[in-house]
Amino acid sequence: MERRGVPAVGAFPSSFSYGNDAVKAPSYDPEEAKKLLEESGWTDTDGDGYADKDGKKLSITWLTYPTRLEQPKLAEYAQSTLKDIGIEVNVNNTADHATYAKNGEFDVYVSSLTTAPTGDPEYFFTSTVVSDAAKNYGKYSSSALDDIITKMHETFDADERGKLAIEAQQTILDDDAYFFVSHLNMGLVSKANVSGLIAHPCDYYEITADLEVK
């Protein structure tokens, strides 16, 4: 990643007590993946390099967008890597990704987002993960997850909220509902007439009384 980011395990970086090291996600094992496909009846019967079953090629649509430079590159990498195990990836790299997402026209939707803009974990779950979340484009639904987030909403102790955030992340990881790729190391550039700008993990807190534009 050339120091531009760190591999992600969960939704939050390790700077949070409930971040990366607090949860576990499956590692990528291509040989085991091939084995699982074969056990499910997906094999390459026509020699084109892709698994097929009952005359149908194993093909998925990968939805992303071009305004974040890393997104098309990630799609290309997935296209190459998944081909090695027999899965065809058709990339839809479009500025109109939101429309496709809302219409459910994807198998994998990859986007970038700030999961804790105010330094609190609840936002990510309520906006993206719970059953009625506005950005739950994959229609993931788990009563167990919803109950955890309801409890988080009613809990004010920071340590307890952190524990619930760990439990919630582990739930969606165990359900294979979401996967996380990287946590970016962001760089800030300002003009010479800007002073008092200090980088902060939560971008709301970069706007302070010391920030001045002359």
Set out the residue ranges of the language-model regions:
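Sec-exported extracytoplasmic/periplasmic mature domains
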Residues: M1-G5, S17, E38-T43, S80-I87, ...
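Append "and occasionally in soluble cytosolic enzymes with long acidic Gly/Pro-rich linkers
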Residues: M1-Y77, E167
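Solvent-exposed loop/turn segments at secondary-structure junctions
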Residues: R3-P7, F16-G19, P66-E70, D96-A98, ...
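Stable alpha-helical elements in mature extracytoplasmic
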Residues: A8, D29-L36, E70-L74, A78-T81, ...
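Short, solvent-exposed loop/beta-turn-alpha elements that line the ligand-binding surface or hinge
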Residues: Y18-K35, T45-L58, K102-G104, F124-E154, ...
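A generic structural signal for short
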Residues: D21-A22, P66-T67, G86, Y137, ...
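Ligand/substrate-recognition segments at binding pockets and active sites
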Residues: D44-T115, M186
